[in-house]
Amino acid sequence: MAIPTQPPIDAEADRIPLAADDHVPYVASHTELAELTPGAILLGIVLGLVFALSSVYLALKVGLTVSASIPISVLSITIFRYLSKISGQKPATILQNNMVQTTGSAGESVAAGVVFTLPALLLLGYNLPWTKVAAVAVVGGLLGVFLMIPLRNALIVKERKTLKYPEGTAAAEVLIVGEERGVQARTVFLGFGLAALYKLVVSGLHVWQEVPRYVFQRLAPTGKIELFGEIRAEISPELTGVGYIIGPRIAGFLFAGGCLSYFVLIPAIKMFGAGLTTIIPPGTGLIADMDATAVRANYVYYIGAGAVTAAGLISLLRSAPTILSAITGGFKRNAEGRGTNTARPRTDIDMPISVVAVGVLVCVIAMIALPQISINILAAALAVGFAFLFVTVSSRITGQIGASSNPISGMTVATVLLTALIFLAIGWTGPEHRVLALTIGGVVCVAAAVAGATSQDLKTGYIVGATPKRQQIGLLFGVTTSALLIGGMIQLLNRAHTTIVEKSYPGVVVSRIDAGAADTVNGVAYQVGHLVEEQGGAPAGKYLVDASHAIHYLVDPGIAGRYPTDVSGRTVEKLDSPKAQIMALVVDGILTQKLPWGLILIGAFLAIAIEILGIPSLPVAVGVYLPISTSATMFMGGVVRWLVEQRLPEEERTGAKADSGPGVLFSSGLIAGGAIMGVGLSVLAIWKVAGNRTAAEVIDVTKHVGVVGVSAAIAMVLYVLCLAVPLYRVGRGGGGRSH
């Protein structure tokens, strides 16, 4: 629908409103269009839930999420246009489409905040009920929206020349082009369908290898063939899509970290430890007997954790000079607004500051009163204080470098670290205080993540001429509905990837027993118990115990578990959840004072050395921490992006055009399709259909595919043909055009 009152828009011009002193939105402030409508809110909620599901899966696998605003914008335009044709109604306005992406984008940020923190409770031996996840997500999400409201004018309006908010600007570009020329969602749907089909064939039917690998070996002086290193790639559509979106530079840093881990650290530890006859803590066996996976789990894991922690804190310190100016600017704006009766234009109306104050107060009361959170006054004060600080930081950082590069985990590590140190200083070192620290971290992490997404949405609204108050209401809807779903998704994925491993610890008696909970292994019924602290060599965790509460089996969580093979011989792929592992390591290590500080400091100084070289340490550190199979596939996606960009004009390689191009839209479809099919396969993994066999076991055709199922080379060729080549062709504009 054309808007006659607007100045002509050059579809090829850069619409970042930084060059002129007076900003002119696409929809004038005096123009009233349909915006906050039930249809827009409902569609935003539905699309938000879809992308929240994919974000949960992606964050659990690799500790990363990507912005959902652009694909949601494209889908909204197409869906509303289709509904308009079949119903004979007027097409949706640009402000309604903006409301859809505003409401829908909240799900991705809530998912990131929750997944980065709360699964750490599983590693410390606790259950993670969906009600706790939902409560923390709702409170943290609402805090993120409320605390961002006083900062909107200072950051989005007053600093529009310095804070570009790239994803928000790109989403506005898509909305405006869709308003003028129409946008087809074929590109997103094509990526979604291809990814879902590929994921089903590879991860469900197992027609060919999902994680092909090559092992480097050499002849040792003893005459034995020993491991020298290995490289593997989890050739999945969602990781390929992530690599394309983040680009070759960041994807290359991630892969460099993986190479450092698998080709330097692991071989070095193996070489220096091969002749040792004593166990080197925190390892549980001789280094000579360990393979690459065991060396990584026992040693490199802590080096990577130290590197990620230090890199996150470094990225946070870099933004320190901007924190004070943003905070003081927000209060100054509110002070200037008091005592004046001048009517503000529609495009500058926020929710009243009184509503913000009441909303924050309600969140504080909920944190103290709700049994699912149940924190004390000191903890609530820490949560609100850290949330306000990092909401400001998050908004500024996303304005400078985008939401995908926002160091949310660094802010959360800082929160958990400082909280744990405060608890240690006042003597709060019991198991319950670890839960308290992680709950505070969860609230702050969700608030910071939501604030970053809120900033991008408000930037989009600022460009297209939306009403901030209505956007903020839409965000409250999106945050709340997504939060209620995410807890159930985490439980489902954890259960589907959980393994039961035979373990025995003589003399250890488990005192915490789940009332009414039981499980059966080989026809024998066991009770379910928990150790929340190491006891007699048995680490904190969930166990199956007999009537005397003696341990028989470890229930290894699907999220961040370490034992992929079940007692039945079934092998599952664990969800690494790297950020949650770091949170558990930090809070448990500080409060129990058992951190392997030597390895942690090696990682920390490694990050510092990388920074001194002028390289951003955070993506390299995350690469050290992640399995190389993950970073290698993202790197391949980045390489495809690089190949595409070599054939594009210079002006189309960066900025809004690059962030909303067909390759990015296709990659968004790859991420959503692969992740949602992964969730579906997780359901099949726990659905018993034939005696004691699951649906996933029934559809597995591994035994019938011969060489295709075992050849790493064939798997790589098929990956290139089925995913990499189509992505390159779409990125070049050879199919599935978005405009």
Predicted regions and their residues:
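Alpha-helical multipass membrane-protein architecture
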Residues: 1-739
